[in-house]
Amino acid sequence: LTALLALKDDHIQLQQLIAAKDVYGVTASGDIPLDIFRSQEQRKNPNAQMNIVVDLDNARLGILPAMTKLVEWGVGETKGKIRVAGTLEEPLLYGSVKIADGSVKVKHLNTVLDAINLDVVFNGNMINLKNLSTKLGKGLLKAEGSYALNTSLDSGYSLHIVADKAQLASQLFTGTINGDVLIEPQKYPDFKNHKGSGEPKMLFRPLVKGQVRLDDVLVNMPTVPELDEGESNIGLDMKLELGPKIHLYNSYLYDIWLKGGINIKGSTLFPTIEGTIKADKGKITYLRTDFKLDNAGLVWVEPGSFLPNVS
């Protein structure tokens, strides 16, 4: 990372900024008024705005390993420029970024994200994800949506994700995913912090709704995960369906075949779950002793918890 700056007439002149790895790089240049670092009441020019242009034409996906340890390698060209305007309180972005036929290898995931196509348009306050798609095995994962930098929470974002026979392979999970999921704001009554009489205050939280089907799955977890309820408040309206050949297998812990499905509503703070996950055959190993399963099932009797009861 190298930068060349100059201070003149109460402005920072960003003459050149380069973030590079090997032959890949992101460049930026422009003007930053010092006024935007002052409170609005103390600004000499109340209309002061940034004007910085970020050039991604030479970035390429090969720069991703330098930006995050989650990516092992990337191949593919990036095209686009983004102009950063506005203030720190209300930034504005203009321009577009496109990727055509790229590939990325994510760490701990054996499946390569292939044929990556991206089309993002920045229009001031609004970021529009017109298309993001990638091949996963013989299937496809795609998404579209929008995000507002400054707006009311009832319309600030939307993300639509579709998985069409998407195939994932990793050490923990291998299988085929079909799904249609929408993430958008949800209005809800804040009973948790409500005091006294009257109606509770209405707030907004993310809502995840849709359906997901799993087929030909092999799950191999060396330890049983802890189901912590957490503090995040996310609305839920999801249907999970298990297709044939859902296999949980670890040579030291379990060998179980599952089927069934559940509907999850409510929120991550207080879920309500209907349905049954059945295990018609299998075994659990504990202290080197095998316990055979015969027509066991997981049901959720009490609302407000992700922990099931075993029947």
What would you call each of these model-derived segments?
Residues 53:
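Structured alpha-helical
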Residues 1-27, 33-44, 50, 61-63, ...:
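Strand-loop-strand
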